[in-house]
A protein has these predicted regions:
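Conserved RecA-like P-loop NTPase helicase motor core
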Residues: 151-156
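Short, ordered loop/turn segments at secondary-structure junctions
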Residues: 136
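Conserved beta strand-loop-helix elements of the APE1-like EEP
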Residues: 157-169
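SAM-dependent methyltransferase catalytic region
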Residues: 1-133, 143
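Conserved active-site and SAM-binding loop architecture
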Residues: 147-149
């Protein structure tokens, strides 16, 4: 069997579930919880969603991203509730828990220079030994231009800029 499980990554692992669901779904949930709870995670690769109006508001992931909001003086830090930020924090948590590993995401690039992302950058610098970021730019709102003066275009058909991020511990 290919080790792919149906689960919400941004939810904390739960104790093994009972028979509330059909056996196959219960078995799937139990196996996913075992992976999340007891298996060392050494490499996380993905392209998390960029959703500023996230519906992923579970207590576990919210408590993890609270680290990124600590000591901020801004009145609003909604940008830190974006799903891609939660997935970066999710990956950071598991790599920290393991003591070593690689987190590789293509994501929204606003954390690179966002004012409200200061603590996020600080925590990432404290967690990882090496950080490599390839800023692909492409943010339509910034109206950036290429070195030759042409309009900067996104690699995807989206308004938000993109970066390829590699975090190594």
């Amino acid at each position: 069997r290919l080790k792919i499980y149906l689960t919400n990554s941004l939810e904390e692992s739960h104790p093994d579930t009972g028979t509330l669901f059909a056996n196959w779904l219960s078995s799937e949930a139990n196996e996913a919880n075992f992976i999340k709870r007891d298996t060392p995670v050494m490499c996380i690769v993905g392209n998390p969603p960029y959703a500023s109006s996230s519906t992923n508001k579970g207590k576990w992931i919210e408590s993890l991203t609270a680290d990124y909001k600590k000591d901020l003086k801004e009145k609003s830090y909604n940008s830190l509730s974006d799903d891609y930020v939660k997935f970066i924090r999710f990956g950071q948590y598991f790599i920290d828990k393991n003591g070593s590993g690689i987190l590789a995401y293509i994501s929204n690039n606003s954390f690179i220079d966002g004012i409200t992302h200061r603590q996020m950058r600080k925590h990432l610098l404290e967690s990882f030994d090496k950080i490599y970021i390839l800023d692909l730019h492409g943010n339509a709102k910034k109206k950036e231009v290429c070195l030759d003066g042409s309009v900067d275009q996104n690699v995807f058909d989206i308004m938000q800029g993109v970066s390829i991020n590699l975090f190594v511990k």
